[in-house]
């Protein structure tokens, strides 16, 4: 289990929720 991997995934999720237009 790598905490750094969780932080990276959390950052990606935050980016996706902050900029949902990029996914459309």
Curated annotation (Swiss-Prot):
Localization: Secreted, Extracellular space, Extracellular matrix, Interphotoreceptor matrix
Alphabetized GO MF terms: retinal binding
Task: Tell me the keywords, alphabetical order.
Answer: Extracellular matrix, Secreted, Transport, Vitamin A
Gene Ontology, cellular component aspect: extracellular region; interphotoreceptor matrix
Q: Which domain of life is it from?
A: Eukaryota
Please explain the role this protein plays, according to its UniProt record: IRBP shuttles 11-cis and all trans retinoids between the retinol isomerase in the pigment epithelium and the visual pigments in the photoreceptor cells of the retina.
Q: What is this protein called?
A: Retinol-binding protein 3
Source species: Ovis aries
């Amino acid at each position: 289990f790598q905490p750094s991997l969780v932080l990276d995934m959390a950052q990606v999720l935050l980016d996706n929720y902050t900029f949902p237009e990029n996914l459309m």
